[in-house]
Amino acid sequence: MRKQVAYLGPKGTYAEKAAHILTKLANFQTPIFVPCNGLHSVIKSIAYNNCDAAVVPIENSVEGGVTATLDALWKYPEIYINRAIVLPIKHALISDGELSNISEVLSHPQALAQCSEWLSENLPNACLLYTSPSPRDA
């Protein structure tokens, strides 16, 4: 029977990439990947046995621990960490203009935090605006 694996969607996110890597490490045969609309949806899907596994972020090098995930490990004692990987994250600034003309940068809060040093050096006057995690935004 094919295993269902929940992850923080939509398709094309780093969470999906991590899900593919982790299912290979776990030897899941042709898993079904289930994108979820929020971290709490991913957590609930595994806590309520709606999937066989879930892929969630535990921490990142800039912002530290992901509190929603850590809180879920306390709230749902039946959830446990089976495998962990380090997934390097690479961000890109996409614009149709010159760097000097950029006045706003839109991205997820985690991405803005991870790029804060570069942004402060290269776009010190740009307004940083938070968006939802979506590769479609690009």
Task: Give residue ranges: language-model regions.
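Domain-level signature for soluble enzymes in the chorismate/prephenate branch of the shikimate pathway
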Residues: 1-136
